[in-house]
Structures are given as C-alpha cells and as structure tokens.
C-alpha cells in the first residue's frame, strides 16, 4: 500500500505525500521538515552571540522581563501549585459539555451534509422549536394589553368604543399572525406524530399476529405431545396390570373336575360381588380393556383464546344436519360432545375441529348432556340416561351417511363432500351403563362426584348413586297433577320461539352441589331442595314463564325463562339481585366469573358484562350482510373461561372468544 511503504531515495525521506497525513492530522513529512528549518533559524537568530551585530537586544530584553516576572510572589505560588498538579489535570479540558458538543458540530464534512435527506415539512426546525414553547407568557401579556383602557361603567353610562392607536393595533395584528402561524406548525407536528403512532401500531399488530401464530403452533404441538404421553401411560398401565397374572396362572397345578367346578363357582360369586361394587365394571362382555377408570389431565390449559379480541371467531363446524339440542365441553380447545335432532351424539376435538367419533346407544334424540373430564352423561327422549367413559374409547371406522344415494344414481362432487363430512369413527367400549327408571323423556340432568340428578317429563326428579348404579331417591313434585291442566289450558306459557306447537318441558333445568339441588320447572318457579331430607327448602317466585335454564355459584343463582327475562337471585337473602330482559324467550344460558351469555331466539349470542352492566352481541349475526343469507338462530350456548360455544338451528357449532 502507498500509505505503508517508502520509496528508496538518496535523502532517506519519502517523496510520496501520504493522502491521510501523519497522525491523522493532515501533516506530511515535507511540512515537518519546513517547520524544523524555521525553528532552527529562529532559535539561532535569538540566541546568537552578543557580538553579532545582526542580532538585536530582543532576546535579552525578553529574558530580563521573564526574570523579573518570576521573582514576584504571585507568580512563584502559581509555579509551585503547578508542580503539585497531576499530569491528568494538566491535560484535562476546561470546556463544558455543551461547548464541546458545539465545537464538534460546528465543523461537519461535506460528505455528511450531502447525505441529509430532504425534508418535506412545510416549516423549519427553528419554527418547530418555537412552536413547542409554551405561550403562557403571551397569554398573560395579551390579557394585560387587552385590559388597558377599560374602566368600570357607572349606572346610566353608555359603553362607547374606546379608540386605540394604529401602532398598537398593528403590533397586535402581527403578534396574532405569528401565533396563527405557530398554530399551523403545531397542527402539522401533531399530524406527523399521529401518522408515526399509526405506523407503530400497525407494526405492533403485525408482530402480535406473528406471535399469536407461533403460540397456536406451540399449543398444537403441546396437545400432540400430551396425547402421545397419555398413550404411553396407558400402555404402561396395561403392562403392569397383566404382568402379575402370567406367572400365577402358569404355576397353578391342575386339579380335579370337582375342584374346578368349585373354583369356577367361587370365581363367579366373587365376580358378581365385585361387579356390583362399581358402575365402571359394567362394560360390554367383549371388551378386553382394563376396568380401571382412567382420567386424562392436562398439564397446562390453552391460553390462545385469551389473547383474541372479545367477539372473535375461533372456529366453526358443521356438526349436524338438524337443530342442535345440547352441547358441552370440558375445557377450552378440549373435547366437545354435541347432540341434535338428527339422532346422533358426536365427539369433537376443538383443537382441530374434527369429529373423533359417535356415541351410539340411544333410541331417540338426546335432549341434555354433560361433560366432566372424560365422563359424559346423556339424557334422551327414550327415557334413559347413559354414561360414557371417553378414556376407554376404541375407534372403529364407520360410515354414517344420511340419505345415501342409490347405486344407480350418480354422485356429484358436492354430494360426495356432504356425505364424507359425517364419515367418522364409532367410539366402542365407551359405554359404561344405563339408568332406565324414568317413564318419559329426560329433559335435564346434572352430575357431580358420585351423584347424578335427572329430571323427566314424567314430573319426577331422580337421584342416582354412580358407584352402585341405581336410583336412591325419587322426588315427586306434589303440585304436578294440579299444574298439568293449567299448563294445557294456559296459552301464555306455550313457547313462542324454539318449539311453537309443543308445550314447555316440565323440568326445564337443574343443578346439584352436595346435598343442595336447584330445579326450575314449567310453572316459572325455582325450588331449592335438600337431598338429605327430600324436601323443598326454599322457592323463588318471580318468573311468569317456564324456566329453561339455570346455574348457581356460592352467592348467586341465575335463571332464564320463556318470559324473555334473566334474573339473578341472591341465595343468602332469597331475593332478586338483578334482572334484565330481551325481545324473545331465553332458550339457553350460562355464566362465568365475568359474563353471562344467553341464547334468546336470535342469530347472535347475548352477552352481559357483570362488572359494568354492558350488553353486547357475539356471533355470526354481528355485522352480517343483509343481502346475503342470514345465520341460523342460536339454540344452545356454553361458556368456560372466556371460551364460548354456540349451537344453531341448522346444526352449526361455532367457537368464539368472550
């Protein structure tokens, strides 16, 4: 390189001028040589011999002045203080930070100035600075100037116009003009800030969307890993249960036929007694699965829906071909069970939106159901209640086509898609047992722990022991016979929404907790029962139509009725805490810690915020195009942890954030 080598020359000096100079300060070797010659000649001239006539007395006079100055006490003190100063203090700059910055910015290379982008702003930087200054002093001065020349008018005096000097008016005009210009600059600055904030918000929305997609992928992967882990745990349990049986059976010697008969009879007796101990042992005879009930517990709950805006749709599924009569799920993005008037009960994976199988066994449509962990209870119009254990599921591929075309008919693409939509699997070995004590359709049920309560159109409530699998108590509503004729003659209690030509369900809704039972019936009353005594503890009167839904917690009980109202009761006082109404009868309702959701005969879900009392709509009917087909009416709703499910009249089930 030219900057790193020297050309050989007789003088030993470089003849090449370095472009950057020495020490980065622009000096070259030629400059240094010239400076050296000047110093040598100057020193020789000043300090030459005294006899030299060419040298004057300047040097001697200067040295004499310096000698006299050094003999002064003030100068000597300064010299002594300088000797005690450290080298760092000697080279330390005495300039302030602002002065250093000013000097550093006072000289800017042309290369940097050429890269400055052109500003499209209509005002200069100085104007923007002036616009940011507070005009408080101007307002004070303006008030003082405007108050000059004013005086208190006495009674009877007219308020005449006071003349002002032209110079004052011109100054006032110029001042107002400058302020008006500043207002324009401030407006432009605010507009620029708003555009900048909008751009930042748009970028943040894009980043949020990317992170949400990543979270969705993580939850999908988490669900897959938990599924694989559950399968491995089940296999390990099967191996541990079958391992002790093999050596025991191999080491048992053969006995006589008499002993064999006795052993068989004893085993049969033991099996009979063991089978009566638990309902979970009553499985089909062909099932080789373990009799132990397995519970699948998630290590972490899904949180994706918590980051969506309220009212956002998560997923939509064409679950059935007819009106949805009952839906329930265990937890957000978990397992959902749905029933409809197409006489099917389907199990769905809410994470993927796929149907995992069917629960077959009822002879009619299912009117009510409940999902708790892996246990599903279904109540049907065939007057039976069946329990299912989804952890024992064994899938068998089947075809559940409805209205299958004949062999001679051609199937177009749309028809084939519709038929393949409901081709799924049968969940065999899920059936546990059936409760068949009712004599009419089961319209409501609820179970908690080992107790299940069912309500039927036969005007009875039955309490079931899920350990023994039998009915332990029947609650006969004494006023059922008297109300039967009233319900048949009174037309105002006939529903006007879901089933206009059928009478209301006698037992519309119920819920139990330990020994407490709340039941809503067709007479509009809510009765609180004590299961220990079988007596009504309290009756809540207020609705004027049949009760269709209810739910309670530690403090409040919420009921929905065909009288179009939802009432919130205080269980401690037995009085109404709050109430509100909609335009149509309430067919379904549920609440969580924040909101109450209800199906009120419309194509949207009615949402009520407990905190601020705000009402808003959620569902496909919000913002729907009036020219297009309207969404179907919402019939059933379920809500857990802000995750909302709605079942519609056309068989569609959709998930929303709430």
From Swiss-Prot:
Biased composition (Basic residues): 139-151
Keywords from the named record: Coiled coil, Membrane, Mitochondrion, Mitochondrion outer membrane, Repeat, WD repeat
Membrane topology: Peripheral membrane protein
WD repeat residue intervals: 319-360, 361-398, 437-476, 482-539, 542-581, 583-618, 629-658
Main location: mitochondrion
GO biological process: mitochondrial fission; peroxisome fission
Region (Disordered): 139-170
GO cellular component: mitochondrial outer membrane; mitochondrion; transferase complex
Coiled-coil regions, chain positions: 209-246
Keyword Lyase: no
Physiological role: Involved in mitochondrial fission. Acts as an adapter protein required to form mitochondrial fission complexes. Formation of these complexes is required to promote constriction and fission of the mitochondrial compartment at a late step in mitochondrial division.
Family indicated by similarity: Belongs to the WD repeat MDV1/CAF4 family.
Protein name: Mitochondrial division protein 1
Species name: Aspergillus fumigatus (strain ATCC MYA-4609 / CBS 101355 / FGSC A1100 / Af293)
